Regions:
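Structural and coupling elements of P-loop NTPases
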Residues: 1-537
């Protein structure tokens, strides 16, 4: 399929489709209600009939986006998926992010593929550690952030105290789009500031259906809600006075964050979030390549792999590479080029994947996510293009903090063991470190959080029939180093240098004191902190 014939009609068609896209992810601390919000958004867009809850309540459907066996067992979303739906003539792509603290590496990759983030805050807890870690990543990527204060139907913090915390800890100015009427735990509804009306909150069947919302004028609200209404108006007024009225440019520039109040479990406040995404979130725009040159959206097809997932369909043992379309039109069946290898890749099996739901996708536009099946040659960070070579920036690796040696339980299955470890490394499930001293039989697995090891063990046993033993190492921090650190630290207690497959040498240390001791004794050694903003070369 040639896309080099760019007629004015074709250019305007691509621009129109890119302009209709809103691609975002939800960032939050575990248990802030992220999967519930995902369900509520899908419900509002009429994608699913009734929302399922992650907590596995009887007679409620399972949450659609949680699909791996471990996720089902634990009620958390470990693997990311993408949900696409239409709302008000806008195509919304919601990229699901793992809901567990340990999976920040996978979450980070998802944040490389979105244009905006929704920061979901538990009203009772405020900004928690994982939320702040993810916020920092969004800040580095210059992603605009919409803030949703969730669970307002339960007792929690004071609304103004939450605004102060957001300002102090993120540096963003809160710009209310809606404001809660009634204190947390006594949720009466919201003042919709854009339309100057009161949306009254009504409890429904535990969120399984869309909440019925009734709207009232400010005068009617003042009469029915009394001091709850006047307090809400006063509070929102204080926030606007000390910050600013809604300003799209300040939001896009990462200086301010729109604020909405909700109860996602009861489907209240969700429509207002959808409206905010449509009206204010940035559409798919030209994406810069490695040299910083933005590739126009009307250029021939290009995209990059932000996630690789295997074992999504047990019957087929398949591999799905998730691609963010950056330019042009993706058409199923087109043969594209992989920038890293220069090899051709046929896109015959292209799907939209959300949870266990899959459907064949024939075309996709900038901002969309395509799942390419049988994509075992593709790796996280790979760029693909139809015409006009392009390479997008590499997706950085997080600094690992947990290290374990892996060995095959059955020596006769070493081949399967090696293949499994290689495959999981390609998928980005785990970082793999090696050295001549340890040998090929005992690679060191490095993870951001300990649950990644459970995923590796589970996948090795079930997907590769290569059960393995893990042995914990005492290291807790890593630094980027060079080859000459290997002999220098060979006999040092509390330190070790290993080679990662991308060619980086990592020096591992028991603790910060071991690191300081070595920095003092070997001032000539390169020991650089691993920053999420330093792409792995």
């Amino acid at each position: 399929v040639s896309q080099d014939v760019l007629t004015p009609a074709r250019i305007s068609g691509i621009h129109k489709e890119a302009g209709r896209r809103r691609t975002f992810a939800v960032i939050s601390h575990p248990d802030a209600g992220k999967s519930t919000l995902t369900e509520a958004l899908a419900l509002h867009a009429k994608v699913i009939g009734t929302a399922g809850a992650s907590s596995g309540k009887a007679n409620r459907k399972e949450t659609v986006s949680d699909w791996m066996q471990m996720e089902k067992d634990r009620g958390i979303s470990i693997s990311s998926a993408a949900l696409q739906f239409s709302y008000r003539d806008t195509v919304i792509n919601l990229l699901d992010t793992p809901g567990h603290a340990d999976f920040s590496e996978d979450t980070y990759r998802v944040l490389a593929a979105v244009d905006c983030a929704v920061m979901l805050v538990d009203a009772a807890k405020g900004l928690e550690t994982q939320t702040m870690k993810l916020f920092e990543v969004c800040k580095q990527r210059n992603l605009p952030i919409i803030t949703v204060i969730n669970k307002w139907d339960r007792p929690g913090l004071d609304a103004l105290a939450l605004m102060d915390e957001i300002t102090e800890r993120t540096g963003l100015q809160p710009m209310p789009l809606t404001w809660a009427v009634g204190i947390s735990g006594d949720f009466r509804g919201v003042w919709d500031l854009r339309n100057d009306r009161f949306a009254r909150f009504q409890r429904n069947n535990a969120g399984a259906q869309i909440a019925l919302t009734e709207y009232f004028t400010p005068e009617e609200a003042a009469e029915s809600q009394g001091s709850n209404w006047t307090d809400a108006v006063d509070e929102a007024g204080l926030v606007i006075e000390s910050n600013l009225e809604f300003d799209v440019e300040a939001f896009h520039a990462g200086k301010a964050t729109p604020i909405l109040f909700s109860s996602a479990a009861l489907n209240f406040g969700v429509k207002e979030l959808l409206d905010a995404l449509v009206d204010f979130a940035p559409p798919a725009a030209p994406r810069p390549d490695v040299d910083g040159n933005p590739r126009p959206v009307e250029s021939p097809f290009s995209g990059f792999v932000f996630k690789v997932q295997a074992g999504m369909n047990k019957a087929h043992r398949d591999h799905v590479a998730f691609i963010r379309v950056c330019s042009g039109v993706f058409e199923r069946g087109m043969v594209v080029t992989q920038t890293r290898t220069g090899k051709s890749f046929a896109t015959k099996y292209a799907q939209q994947v959300f949870g266990r739901e899959r459907e064949v996708i024939d075309e996709a536009y900038p901002g969309d996510v395509v799942g390419l099946v049988n994509a075992s040659s593709l790796r996280v960070g790979d760029s693909l293009f139809l015409e006009g070579p392009v390479e997008y920036p590499a997706i950085p690796l997080f600094a690992p903090e947990h290290f374990q040696v892996a060995r095959s339980k059955d020596p006769s299955k070493f081949k399967q063991f090696r293949r499994g470890i290689e495959q999981l490394e390609h998928e980005g499930v785990i970082q793999v470190l090696r050295s001549d001293v340890r040998g090929d039989q005992a690679p060191v697995l490095a993870a951001v959080g300990p649950m990644q090891f459970e995923v590796v063990e589970d996948r090795m046993a079930h997907d590769f029939s290569a059960p393995m033993r893990l042995e914990r190492l005492p290291y807790s921090l890593a630094r980027i180093s060079t080859a000459d650190a290997m002999p220098a630290l060979a006999n040092v207690i509390g330190a070790e240098v290993l080679l990662r497959s991308d060619g980086e040498y990592l020096a591992l240390f028991n603790d910060v004191w071991a690191l300081r001791r070595i920095e003092k004794n070997h001032p000539d050694l390169t020991l650089v902190p691993i920053g999420t903003h330093n792409p792995a070369k």
